[in-house]
Regions:
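Non-ligating segments of multi-cofactor redox enzymes
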Residues: 1-229
Length: 229
């Protein structure tokens, strides 16, 4: 999206949000993955300026469209397309003028976006001891790299070719958030308490085994499992 088109979209979003409230209000809001530092009342504080979109070096942040009702024009992350790589200094946070992204967010430990959940372990290539093939990640490698950071993402993906799949663990920007545990000659990916819900694992998992649940906490999703262990 060009800067001109981006500006026009932002203005249109503001206009529609103000004049079509009666129509948008009938749409049930969805729960979306928000950028790092998003406060509890993010939807009411986000002014739809798009500054976070403009400064994100990974092009992870987008603005919600017309189908999203009252959330139209607010910033979100579609982890299945591009997760958040938790940049140094969090440029999206620094660019936010309204406080929708808390400026107290300066380190990864300050981030809480959600939590990753393994949905279908039987389809996991690591669990099946299958190797990564070019066809598996071609859609990711085909993305244009606009800077060194995006190229580094591709380099990590390429380094996994021909090896037993470990894309989620190797790509995760948070040390220790995803780990493998070996049980009965199989690799099982575990989501640990360090997970902040950045969504990178969902992006790189071509088997669609992992997804991020926005706003959820590790203890909520894994409490039952931990009790049984």
């Amino acid at each position: 999206m060009t800067r001109r088109n981006f500006t026009l979209f932002s203005l249109a979003s503001l206009a529609l949000a103000g004049t079509s409230g009666f129509m948008l209000g009938k749409v049930e809001p969805k729960v979306h993955l928000r950028p790092p530092g998003a406060v509890e009342n993010f939807e009411s504080l986000c002014i739809k300026c798009g500054q976070c979109v403009q400064v994100c070096p990974y092009h992870s942040i987008e603005l919600l469209g017309f189908d999203d009702g009252v959330n139209l024009g607010t910033a979100y992350i579609n982890a299945s397309k591009r997760g958040c790589y938790l940049c140094d200094l969090f440029p999206c946070v620094l660019a936010c003028p309204s406080g929708a992204l808390s400026h107290n967010t300066s380190e990864i430990k300050d981030v809480y976006m959600g939590v990753a959940v393994v949905k279908n372990l039987e389809q996991c290539l690591a669990f099946k001891t299958q190797s990564v093939e070019t066809s598996h990640i071609q859609h990711l490698l085909a993305r244009k790299s606009y800077n060194e950071r995006e190229q580094e993402v591709k380099d990590i993906l390429s380094a996994n070719l021909g090896k037993t799949c470990a894309l989620c663990v190797n790509s995760c920007p948070v040390n220790g958030a995803l780990v493998f545990e070996r049980k009965e000659q199989r690799q099982i990916v575990l989501v640990k308490d360090e997970c902040v819900g950045c969504g990178v694992c969902e992006e790189v998992c071509f088997a669609r085994v992992i997804e991020v649940v926005p706003h959820a906490k590790h203890r909520q999703k894994f409490k039952t499992k931990e009790k049984n262990e």
